[in-house]
């Protein structure tokens, strides 16, 4: 019998598959006593456990033959209608996906070939980098910070390159927590429209704003201008539950058709029971739920910022988010976030080093903190521990 060589059997794309750094780090943070700022996990106290149990039983009792059957790839019609009303589009423009991660995977399959240029912020969402990398593209990056991407740098890149699409997170970006101001959104969109480019706008955190009102999305601004080139990705993970894996994409019919066809080859459709459950949970009291979600995250963000102001040495810089789930931290040049991570684990606190959020490398002195899963007391104690680790690292310089 000839020995089997798995590496010979794998396709070229398998060589591009990399483990999620966050998923691997989460394994290290599971030991007892660890306070974790690592995973971008929503606050578990917001999960509607009792309501979900009652709604699931009701769906199975009254519509079980529908919930347990195959369904159209585009999604459960009442949920598509709900999304359409929420976002301000027509139901036929909506595709329900199995989480936003699937939407990113579908976008990569539809738009990218090996060597295709695709533009991302640096840093950007690690899951998007992971999804797009499967297609073997060429990553173009522009610096991003507390007020979104550097538009002067973006303009310079667009003078010499024509990316297949720009992947952007204008509202409460993962990992920086940055919020692109309205004038910058308009300038960015003007650059895109002048060149006839596609934008993939990931708006998973759209409702997690701490101020009085939500800024209009690039998608909304483009629609007002009559421009069809923005593909809009949204999710129920942050406002309801990530475990249900229900999200959506909104796009021009020509683009949506290709995404639907790609989804047919991936999983046929998002689980019908999950779609029906999301619709049942949100068809009443949605506004009240969003207000509670915003209040919880606002209080947690305030708790983290108060603790950071108290515990973190002045040489260390960090963002002050206006929404979302993350604080982005920058150590003095020459210091390593991975070195800090090892010290932090000794103090029983964890975070995510920033390097993996940079598609083309860099960011060795950066890190992401999530305030979503711990309560205010846990946040304060976790930051105390992080402060000790930081002071220990800085003492070596």
Curated annotation (Swiss-Prot):
<feature type="binding site">
    <location>
        <begin position="100"/>
        <end position="101"/>
    </location>
    <ligand>
        <name>pyridoxal 5'-phosphate</name>
    </ligand>
</feature>
<feature type="binding site">
    <location>
        <position position="174"/>
    </location>
    <ligand>
        <name>substrate</name>
    </ligand>
</feature>
<comment type="pathway">
    <text>Amino-acid biosynthesis; L-lysine biosynthesis via AAA pathway; L-alpha-aminoadipate from 2-oxoglutarate: step 5/5.</text>
</comment>
<feature type="binding site">
    <location>
        <position position="40"/>
    </location>
    <ligand>
        <name>substrate</name>
    </ligand>
</feature>
<feature type="binding site">
    <location>
        <position position="174"/>
    </location>
    <ligand>
        <name>pyridoxal 5'-phosphate</name>
    </ligand>
</feature>
<dbReference type="InterPro" id="IPR004839">
    <property type="entry name" value="Aminotransferase_I/II_large"/>
</dbReference>
<dbReference type="GO" id="GO:0047536">
    <property type="term" value="F:2-aminoadipate transaminase activity"/>
</dbReference>
<feature type="binding site">
    <location>
        <begin position="235"/>
        <end position="237"/>
    </location>
    <ligand>
        <name>pyridoxal 5'-phosphate</name>
    </ligand>
</feature>
<dbReference type="InterPro" id="IPR015422">
    <property type="entry name" value="PyrdxlP-dep_Trfase_small"/>
</dbReference>
<dbReference type="Pfam" id="PF00155">
    <property type="entry name" value="Aminotran_1_2"/>
</dbReference>
<dbReference type="GO" id="GO:0030170">
    <property type="term" value="F:pyridoxal phosphate binding"/>
</dbReference>
<feature type="modified residue" description="N6-(pyridoxal phosphate)lysine">
    <location>
        <position position="263"/>
    </location>
</feature>
<comment type="function">
    <text>Catalyzes the transfer of an amino group between 2-oxoadipate (2-OA) and glutamate (Glu) to yield alpha-aminodipate (AAA). It can also transaminate glutamate, leucine, and aromatic amino acids. It also contributes in the biosynthesis of other amino acids such as leucine.</text>
</comment>
<comment type="subunit">
    <text>Homodimer.</text>
</comment>
<feature type="binding site">
    <location>
        <position position="70"/>
    </location>
    <ligand>
        <name>pyridoxal 5'-phosphate</name>
    </ligand>
</feature>
<keyword id="KW-0808">Transferase</keyword>
<dbReference type="InterPro" id="IPR050859">
    <property type="entry name" value="Class-I_PLP-dep_aminotransf"/>
</dbReference>
<dbReference type="InterPro" id="IPR015424">
    <property type="entry name" value="PyrdxlP-dep_Trfase"/>
</dbReference>
<feature type="binding site">
    <location>
        <begin position="202"/>
        <end position="205"/>
    </location>
    <ligand>
        <name>pyridoxal 5'-phosphate</name>
    </ligand>
</feature>
<keyword id="KW-0032">Aminotransferase</keyword>
<comment type="similarity">
    <text>Belongs to the class-I pyridoxal-phosphate-dependent aminotransferase family.</text>
</comment>
<feature type="binding site">
    <location>
        <position position="245"/>
    </location>
    <ligand>
        <name>pyridoxal 5'-phosphate</name>
    </ligand>
</feature>
<protein>
    <recommendedName>
        <fullName>2-aminoadipate transaminase</fullName>
        <ecNumber>2.6.1.39</ecNumber>
    </recommendedName>
</protein>
<keyword id="KW-0663">Pyridoxal phosphate</keyword>
<dbReference type="GO" id="GO:0019878">
    <property type="term" value="P:lysine biosynthetic process via aminoadipic acid"/>
</dbReference>
<feature type="binding site">
    <location>
        <position position="368"/>
    </location>
    <ligand>
        <name>substrate</name>
    </ligand>
</feature>
<dbReference type="InterPro" id="IPR015421">
    <property type="entry name" value="PyrdxlP-dep_Trfase_major"/>
</dbReference>
<feature type="site" description="Recognizes the side-chain carboxyl group of acidic compounds">
    <location>
        <position position="23"/>
    </location>
</feature>
């Amino acid at each position: 019998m000839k020995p089997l060589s798995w590496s010979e059997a794998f396709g070229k794309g398998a060589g591009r598959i990399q483990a999620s750094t966050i998923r691997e780090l989460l394994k290290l943070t599971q030991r007892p006593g660890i306070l974790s700022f690592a995973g971008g996990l929503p606050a578990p106290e917001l999960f509607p456990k009792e309501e979900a149990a009652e709604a699931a039983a009701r769906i199975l009792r009254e519509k079980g033959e529908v919930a347990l059957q195959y369904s159209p790839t585009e999604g459960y019609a009442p949920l598509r209608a709900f999304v359409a009303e929420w976002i301000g589009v027509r139901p036929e423009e909506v595709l329900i996906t199995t989480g936003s991660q699937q939407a990113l995977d579908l976008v990569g399959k539809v738009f990218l070939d090996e060597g295709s240029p695709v533009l991302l912020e640096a840093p950007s969402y690690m899951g998007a980098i992971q999804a797009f990398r499967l297609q073997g593209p060429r990553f173009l990056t522009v610096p991003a910070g507390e007020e979104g991407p550097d538009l002067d740098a973006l303009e310079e890149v667009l003078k010499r390159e024509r990316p297949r699409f720009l992947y952007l997170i204008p509202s409460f970006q993962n990992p920086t927590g940055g919020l692109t101001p309205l004038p910058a959104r308009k300038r960015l969109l003007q650059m895109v429209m002048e060149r006839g480019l596609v934008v993939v706008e990931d708006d998973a955190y759209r409702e997690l704003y701490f101020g009085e009102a939500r800024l209009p999305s690039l998608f909304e601004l483009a629609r007002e201008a009559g421009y069809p080139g923005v593909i809009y990705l949204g999710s129920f993970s942050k406002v309801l539950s990530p475990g249900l894996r229900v999200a959506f994409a909104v796009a021009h019919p020509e683009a949506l058709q290709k995404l639907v066809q790609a989804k047919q080859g991936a999983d046929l459709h998002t689980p019908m029971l999950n779609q029906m459950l999301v619709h049942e949970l949100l068809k009443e009291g949605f506004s009240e739920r969003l207000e509670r979600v915003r209040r919880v995250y606002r209080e947690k963000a305030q708790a983290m910022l108060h603790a950071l102001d108290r515990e973190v040495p002045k040489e260390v810089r960090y963002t002050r988010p206006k929404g979302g789930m993350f604080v982005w931290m920058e150590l003095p040049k020459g210091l390593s976030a991975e070195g800090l991570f090892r010290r932090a684990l000794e103090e029983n606190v964890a975070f995510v080093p920033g390097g993996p959020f940079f598609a083309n490398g860099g960011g060795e002195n950066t890190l992401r903190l999530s305030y979503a899963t711990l309560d205010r007391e846990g946040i304060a104690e976790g930051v105390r521990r992080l402060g000790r680790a930081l002071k220990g690292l800085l003492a070596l310089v």
